[in-house]
Amino acid sequence: MILIPAGPFKMGSSDKDIMWAARYFHSESLDWYRDETPLHEVTLPAFKIDKVPVTMRDFSKYQQATGQPPSREHDNALFNHPLQPVVSLPWKQARDYCHWAKKRLPTEAEWEKAARGTDGRYYPWGNEADALNANIRGKGDIYRYTNQGGTIPENVSPYGVMDLAGNVWEWTENWYQPHPDNQYENDLYGEQFKVIKGGSWNSNLDLARGSVRGKALPGQKKNYIGFRCVAAN
């Protein structure tokens, strides 16, 4: 696990940030970005986070230890290499794995600090929208689906955490609620969706920005959603 030191960081996006994203990625509307605002300071205690997403090998050990049969969704050679991220599991099963491992799911703020550091950068590696630094859709890289954790050396955060942009969206602990002082109404806020972060092999580089707030129903099983765990320092 990687230590994330205590202290403040910049979470979310400013109006300037979302206007940059909308222009750069040719978005038709700023409405897609409004839930990222405002840019605000959050202070967190120190914590530790998994260096890479939980793997199929890790998850298989959990299933064996708890007497669970192999999941039917994992009988797919495109996604079940031992070192690929485990995918196609609901939020509760991800949370249960973390508890079994004496860890927990990250909060949205913890995940975002681990990805962006303290300077409000757009991507783990900085502000440059370089599609070669992440496993995303449509750039013709060697990964058609998920990649084994840590195999793209450029995809590293200021703290040394890997694969926080692209590869798999990652479950967080939080419900999809507005950021403090967010000024925009959204009918999807509430206790219906869980926040997912990071983008995936099946999404574009815009959605791999650290401030992006993906959302998924807790019961959904998607081959582009995985997770990692955190623990107290």
Question: Which functions belong to the PLM regions below?
Answer:
Residues K10, D15-D31, P69, H74-G214, ...:
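Functional-site microenvironments in short loops/helix caps that host divalent-cation chemistry
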Residues H40-E41, D50, P158-G160, P218:
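Short, surface-exposed beta-strand/loop micro-motifs that present aromatic residues
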Residues M1-G67, W91-K92, E128, R213, ...:
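Short, compositionally biased
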